[in-house]
Amino acid sequence: MTIRTRVAPSPTGDPHLGTAYIALFNYCFAKQQGGEFVLRIEDTDQVRSTAESEQAIMDSLRWLGLEWDHGPDVGGEFGPYRQSERSDLYKKYAHQLVDDGKAFYCFATSEELDKMREEQMAEGLRPKYDGRGLNHTDDEIKANLAAGKPYVIRMKIPSEGTFKFNDYLRDEIEIPWENVDMQVLLKADGFPTYFLANVVDDHHMQISHIFRGEEWINSAPKLLKLYEDFGWEAPVLGHLPLLRNPDKSKLSKRKNPTSINYYKEMGYLPEAVLNYLGRMGWSMPDEREKFTLNEMIENFDMKRVSLGGPVFDVDKLSWLNGMWIRENLTDEQLIQRFVDWKFNGEMLAKVLPEAKARINTLSDLVDLAGHFVGGIPTYDPALLTAGKADEDVIRQALQFFVWQLEGLRSFDKPAIFAIAKEVATFHELKIKDFLEPIFVAITGKTSSTSVLDAMEILGSDLSRARLRVALAHLGISKKQAKNIERAYREYPSA
């Protein structure tokens, strides 16, 4: 049997460190045994999925040094590798489950389901689908279908007992069926949910082992029951520990940069980032901290993964990155890395048109536009509140601005300005007064090139990181944080 693993990210945002971590461990497991690695794109969310995000995922994984044997850009015998291109297959299998009595139609509207949940919560019950679709007679189902009434297809779940399964990395896990919902398999728009699409794809692509994050443990009964319902052999299933912040909280972009692109833009070496991800819950037999991808593959043993939450510490990554620079790069190689990073024609072409009208000598460019080739600028935090606006208002407005930028699909000047204008208006600030602290946070100065142009050139990850540092300079107490979160719920676009 060919060992075949996969990673299946959704192209709905920035390429995440967690995606790279899961991809790396699946990749090493397969390659250590002479197997194959598959990249599949889960783009069934047609509202949030973008081609730009898909390309960013592939670019970031390749930047790290990971390649795939099968995927949307390289093809393969199991394609297509975008779920949006396999929708007919999912519909076929969803209806097959209905015909086999393993799934059922549900015609309940979203309003009816909202009311159901409200009533359950009012009674102190955990919100859960109540199985109302199971009560439809055959005649009712035929009439609803003939009338073109919208429906979803849900899987049938036992009402009592427990489900037991063996996890590759853990002891036997037992989950009561009462904690498992009647999962929607096919949505009203005809697209599948994660559960159906993944089972169908993993079966057809002959995936032998699935290693995913531990947040999916409670969904394992649904996944494995679908294999049973189809009469297919299930792959080996294992759940890797989640990456954690130094305070042990789940790695989240609201606390620390989580995008692979951020670390690329900050000047980290891909070898060092991949090396550090390889140390997340796993170590070399000789405990050495610095190793290459090939060395990791040669020594990899998934059974040696520690289940305690591995901590992603940026300071430790920086230390390791420094080791890679000093020990692995010649002066000539380091020069080329600098050129590839920021000191190149592509970057200058972005910066010079804006700067040209404001410089008299070439050396003026360093002071005027140095923030384009730096990481996090240093400045006097007092500059953030030197304007007319109240400090508490600026603090909340900046936090709203960061949260709104997180959901921005196209990080360009018009879109950034629109959000800034909306946030300023909500806080009764003049846009000029709101842009002043943003200017300082992004450039580290009170005068330079356009801050909105700078944000577009720097990109989403680095811009948001600089804004988060500004918020840290301003300081947010636990009480203030709660008040800001409460106020954000009233924000129109929250």
Curated annotation (Swiss-Prot):
InterPro entries reported in the protein's UniProt record: aa-tRNA-synth_I_cd-bd (IPR045462), aa-tRNA-synth_I_codon-bd_sub2 (IPR020751), aa-tRNA-synth_I_CS (IPR001412), aa_tRNA-synth_I_cd-bd_sf (IPR008925), Glu-tRNA-ligase_bac/mito (IPR004527), Glu/Gln-tRNA-synth (IPR000924), Glu/Gln-tRNA-synth_Ib_cat-dom (IPR020058), GluQ/Sye (IPR049940)
Major location category of this protein: cytoplasm
Catalytic activity: tRNA(Glu) + L-glutamate + ATP = L-glutamyl-tRNA(Glu) + AMP + diphosphate
Annotated motif 'HIGH' region, positions: 9-19
Single GO BP term: glutamyl-tRNA aminoacylation
Cross-referenced CDD domains: GluRS_core
Binding site for ATP: 253
Span of the signal peptide: none
GO cellular component: cytosol
Enzyme Commission code(s) on record: 6.1.1.17
Span of the annotated motif 'KMSKS' region: 250-254
MF term (GO), any: zinc ion binding
UniProt keyword annotation of rRNA-binding present: no
Keywords: Aminoacyl-tRNA synthetase, ATP-binding, Cytoplasm, Ligase, Nucleotide-binding, Protein biosynthesis
Localization (cell): Cytoplasm
Subunit structure: Monomer.
UniProt function note: Catalyzes the attachment of glutamate to tRNA(Glu) in a two-step reaction: glutamate is first activated by ATP to form Glu-AMP and then transferred to the acceptor end of tRNA(Glu).
Family to which this protein belongs: Belongs to the class-I aminoacyl-tRNA synthetase family. Glutamate--tRNA ligase type 1 subfamily.
Name of this chain's protein: Glutamate--tRNA ligase
Taxonomic source organism: Pseudoalteromonas translucida (strain TAC 125)
